[in-house]
Every structure is written in C-alpha cells, then in structure tokens.
Amino acid sequence: NCDRDAVRALEHLGIESEIVWHADGLPADPDGIVIPGGFSYGDYLRAGAMAARTPILDDVRAAADSGTPVLGVCNGAQIGSESGLTPGAFTTNRSARFQCEPVYLRVENADTPWTAAYEVGDVIEVPIAHGEGRFEIADDRLAALEDDDRVLFRYCDADGEVTDAANPNGSKHGVAGVLGEDDHVAVLMPHPERASLPDIGPTDGQGILRAFE
C-alpha cells in the first residue's frame, strides 16, 4: 500500500515511474524497480513470504541478474530477503508490536548507487513503519556481509552512535539495510519515500531514491 508513496517521491525528483500489477509481469527492460512497502497477502505466514513466491518475482530476479537497479523498501525488503535477492531475514520486532516512528540511520558504505549522495558516517532521518523489521542472520554470514562492505545502513542515535537504545527493533548489529550480491540490489526497512517530500517533513531519503536518476 506504499506504491503510490513511492511514485510520488520519485516523480518529485523528476524520475518517471509507473505502478505494475503483480499479475501483469514486468514491462520489458525497466530502468529500475522498486518493491514497495505495504502488507502483501496480509503478511500471512511470514511478512513477504507469499509475495516472494509469485511469478513476477522471477521477472524481478531476472532483471536484477541483468544489472537492473532493484530497491526493496519495508515489505519490499522482506520480499527481497524471502526471494533470495539479499541475505538474511526480517522477523518480529523485539517489542513484538508494530512501530511507526522516525529513526536515525548511519551510512556505512557510500560507494553504492543508493548512497552516492552521502558520505560514510553521515546520519540521516528516515521513518520506519513495521512489525517485522528485525534483521536476523547467522553470525558467520553477518561477518562475511560486513567484511564485504554490504551493510548499507545501521540504526543509530542523532550523533551517529550505534547503540542498543537507538535500535528500534532489535536488528542484529543494528543493520537497517543491506546489499545483494551486487551493489545495484538493495533492501532496507526504513521508508526513504516518506522522507523525500519537503511538504511533509525531512528529505534525507531523497539521496537513496536518486539512484534511479
């Protein structure tokens, strides 16, 4: 249900976009793909699990394999992890409740299309809105992820300190966003499209969406 939010944010940046119904499949040769937030299939079974097994995800994986930029946001991040586009999994928040609030993110890797507008260590404010946003992954796989510089963002406080108190959902090592095997595929739980329009609040999320320019 965040598809229109994503379209509005992209079009505010001058990026033409269209909403594609899952049953219709992807148009040929898209310049980029956003898997938006929402509650696909009511989040039954696990958030993103059923949507990850729909035929259009075969199209998305094929596009990603060909080098098309793919960004999964919130439920789109859950779908991305469930479909194997990115490592790890997103599970129930430590609080065991839905959380909708602004959070701070620290940029961990600025050498990607999604973070080219920032510097390493920059702190941006972007809202979250999820009940299953806690990032989990085996310790050895997390170590490999960190060694490969595939962590995009971590939850932090306003000063950029990654602390347990600043971690809204209990994500392992404060991870808020990660890259796939290649840096043109990324997922994150916070909503950059909700931090892109100056008439509703901070615009720190614009830099992420500018990867589609």
Model-derived segments and spans:
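N-terminal beta1-alpha1 cap of cysteine-dependent amidohydrolase-like domains
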Residues: 1-73, 80-87, 91-98, 106, ...
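C-terminal and late-domain segments of enzyme folds
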Residues: 9, 114-213
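Glycine-rich His-Gly loop
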Residues: 37-39, 75, 131, 190
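Sequence-level detector for tyrosine residue identity
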Residues: 41-44, 104, 118, 155
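Hydrophobic, well-ordered secondary-structure segments
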Residues: 76-77, 102, 142
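Short acidic/polar capping segments at secondary-structure boundaries
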Residues: 76-78, 85, 96-97, 109-112, ...
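Alpha/beta-hydrolase-fold enzymes
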Residues: 91-122, 128-129
